[in-house]
Amino acid sequence: MEFTASPKPQLSSRANAFSIAALMSSGGSKEKEATENTIKPLEQFVEKSSCAQPLGELTSLDAHGEFGGGSGSSPSSSSLCTEPLIPTTPIIPSEEMAKIACSLETKELWDKFHELGTEMIITKSGRRMFPTIRVSFSGVDPEAKYIVLMDIVPVDNKRYRYAYHRSSWLVAGKADPPLPARLYVHPDSPFTGEQLLKQMVSFEKVKLTNNELDQHGHIILNSMHKYQPRVHIIKKKDHTASLLNLKSEEFRTFIFPETVFTAVTAYQNQLITKLKIDSNPFAKGFRDSSRLTDIERESVESLIQKHSYARSPIRTYGGEEDVLGDESQTTPNRGSAFTTSDNLSLSSWVSSSSSFPGFQHPQSLTALGTSTASIATPIPHPIQGSLPPYSRLGMPLTPSAIASSMQGSGPTFPSFHMPRYHHYFQQGPYAAIQGLRHSSAVMTPFV
């Protein structure tokens, strides 16, 4: 008995559009189209940066897209290495571009990091690189103009993790989907050849980020992936209007293997952290004061003494207050944070320039601002010096007592320990100021 297959039910055009077969085929075509438009060129670029030759033998990439090693041999062509990031041109680079050489500055510092395994922090807002890529060029035409730019390419298609028990990086799996590749054009471009011969080019403003939606021009990287910075130099022609079309331009690419780094969100190797703190001049906040040398410590102390913000103007000096006398004239003046270049203490300036209503400075006290050579003893506390003079017992001095004291070794100031703040300041800033401004306000001794 023969069985005949029943004919497939015919679906309408509207129903056929929502069938499983139609949805799968349309989804596959869209995914394929998106892959061809976005991922494919970048995948070729990733493979281009890690194929054929080891990084140790790579020195430069000419305009034909071929690597030039130290021995002068070029790698064999590979199906994986078909197109670099910068469009290649079939024209062989001119002799002028072939003569250009590029050297890495601070190579010794890069070597130290490379031995430990360089790590670079990436953040959402962007983080600058340290060490910084600094290069110098030779063999350029002094009369020509050049554009210098930099990009950072993945070393391989692997993701890494740090093994703390082994203090080394291990392969953790396949790399994450590649992020949009960006070229960083040096902000001072175009350079003249004469400028490139006289100065080095620093990419200190380059920032690394892991924000895929970054709109600030930072270089986007994946964490726990290894990257290789590359420096490009392009000869600018008269018709070069922008850097968007590089197909007709002559360029050279230089690679320095010691600049390979791993992008991280937090340092993994403690030795890298220590080396960055010790080498980075902007990381002094992380250093312990015990690491300072004697010369550095003396310079810091002298800097503190020269600036008035090092000590509050209403803070009393430690220990007993010095009084003006015969012994103080032979003793050098105690160092003060208020001492200026002309040895005029800030307290004397306050006492001579600011007065309160109802009080008139003695004539000899106002002369402190003009004659300081005869005074070799420290000036009392700023606020204390601004008050009417009192005897050692805390009683106000009469004008005759003041005049007699001026004829001797100078005015007599209280030697007992004074409270830190006057009761005017305990009222709050606004109330204290209003009290001082009142016409009938009279300053009273510290209580």
Swiss-Prot record:
- Quote the cellular component terms of the Gene Ontology held in the record: chromatin; cytoplasm; nucleus
Keywords carried by this UniProt record: Atrial septal defect, Cardiomyopathy, Developmental protein, Disease variant, DNA-binding, Nucleus, Transcription, Transcription regulation
**Which residues carry the record's DNA-binding region feature?**
109-288
- In the UniProt record, does the keyword Chloroplast occur? no
GO MF annotations in UniProt = DNA-binding transcription activator activity, RNA polymerase II-specific; DNA-binding transcription factor activity, RNA polymerase II-specific; RNA polymerase II cis-regulatory region sequence-specific DNA binding; RNA polymerase II transcription regulatory region sequence-specific DNA binding; RNA polymerase II-specific DNA-binding transcription factor binding; sequence-specific double-stranded DNA binding
Q: Where is this region: Disordered?
A: 62-81, 316-340
How far does the signal peptide extend, from start to end residue?
Answer: none
Q: What is its main location?
A: nucleus
User: Do you know which Pfam families this protein is assigned to?
Assistant: T-box
Q: Where is the composition biased (Polar residues)?
A: 327-340
- Which InterPro entries does this one have? p53-like_TF_DNA-bd_sf, T-box_DNA-bd, T-box_sf, TF_T-box, TF_T-box_CS
Give the location in the cell.
Nucleus
> What's its job?
Acts as a transcriptional activator and repressor required for cardiac development and may have key roles in the maintenance of functional and structural phenotypes in adult heart.
This protein's name: T-box transcription factor TBX20
Q: Which organism is it from?
A: Homo sapiens (Human)
